Design a protein with these regions (language model features):
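Acidic helix-start/capping segments at beta-turn-to-alpha-helix junctions
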Residues: 1-6
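Metal-dependent phosphodiesterase/phospholipase catalytic core, i.e.
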Residues: 7-123, 149, 164
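C-terminal active-site rim and adjoining tail of enzyme catalytic domains
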Residues: 43-45, 123-224
């Protein structure tokens, strides 16, 4: 098969087609048009087509860092494609890690790329700092991706982050992943209150659907 860039297991939400991705040929896929924004039947169609991972890597090479959200147990194949493209230091690869998960950043294939373990916050009460500590044992992930979590869980994670020199990444998508900090809509109104608070409290990588606004805010910090 061919590795392609698509979020869902079906093409229904994000394209003008229907059916399972695994049932379609590459030729079938490349006839489909992508829908705008988050997709859905009411979302306007664009002139954009589904692209392969190889095409995406070639387009991004030398320009941007790609966050590859791998949707199946195909990490070896994905990272092999990244290596063939010579982009091991231009992609982020992530997978979930719990308290009993071995330190993944030290293991193939994750040890060849920028790897972020996604900390599992079981029932919203996990000892995230302990999971992060375990993931940094004889390993050096580039960052810990934070799950939806309580604000009270953050300080201990910041301490682990500083001790092991591993950055913290958080989503400000939707209502945001740290309770009480706010999300993208709040940040576009008052970036210092949301993104600024995250940064001041120890987060240095933010995933957002408002990248232009975040870049503008970051520029104000750099100018200080």
């Amino acid at each position: 098969g061919t590795l392609v860039m698509l979020h869902d297991a079906t093409v229904d939400r994000t394209t003008d087609g229907s059916g399972k991705l695994s049932d379609l040929t590459l030729a079938d896929l490349q006839k489909l048009r992508l829908r705008s924004d988050e997709g859905g039947a009411q979302a306007p169609l664009t002139d954009q087509r589904v692209v392969t991972l190889e095409q995406m890597l070639a387009k991004a090479k030398g320009h941007i860092l790609l966050n590859l959200d791998v949707k199946d147990a195909i990490y070896v194949q994905v990272i092999d494609a990244v290596a063939r493209a010579g982009m091991q230091h231009q992609v982020i690869v992530k997978t979930e890690a719990g308290i009993f998960t071995a330190p993944l950043a030290a293991m193939p294939p994750f040890n060849t790329v920028y790897f972020f373990p996604i900390l599992i916050n079981a029932h919203g009460t996990a000892d995230l700092a302990a999971i992060a500590t375990a993931q940094a044992r004889n390993a050096h992930p580039m960052a810990f991706e934070l799950p939806k979590m309580a604000a009270a869980q953050l300080p201990a994670l910041v301490a682990v982050s500083k001790k092991h020199n591993v950055r913290l990444m958080v989503n400000s998508l939707w209502e945001g992943f740290i309770a009480g900090y706010g999300g993208d809509a709040d940040a576009e109104r008052d970036p210092n209150k949301v993104w600024g608070r995250m940064y001041r409290d120890g987060v240095s990588i933010i995933q957002t659907d408002a990248p232009e606004a975040l870049l503008r805010y970051r520029a104000t910090l750099e100018a200080r």
